[in-house]
């Protein structure tokens, strides 16, 4: 009996973690080029998740829904990659190269971790805007930050992805802190329920 294989086409696959020129020091892609590139690769949708802000969201949505170019009709998915702190009001951090280190943290752990949030409906968009605003007005210190208490208050309508190697979950896994990684997953699942997902990212290693 031959084994059946699951085939994933480009039409089934959507990139949910992308940075544009609105990600300071971390984005080279121009928003105006996103729809064309997505269309050329056979995608029907694409997400924008810039670091610490949603400044490019409207421009991104307009580019994906260009009325003058039906060929580039890509479904825009809007989110952001937030900086997550244990306490958004905490100070006493310092720069160490490209890392942000918190006083008293063992083995020089970074104080701010990454977390991807994506709006799945209008309420999610409202909460995305609220979290972005509060990260700058209440949580800004080196980076615009949010914390778990804000997430718990403004989680409705949002999808949460664990993010990159700089996330709470993946950084703990990378350093062998498996119980801490499991604990973090449990916390996010408590907040987002079925809308929390572990992110899979291509890293070029077989």
What are these regions (language model features)?
Residues 1-206:
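Phosphodiester-processing cores and adjacent nucleic acid-binding clamps
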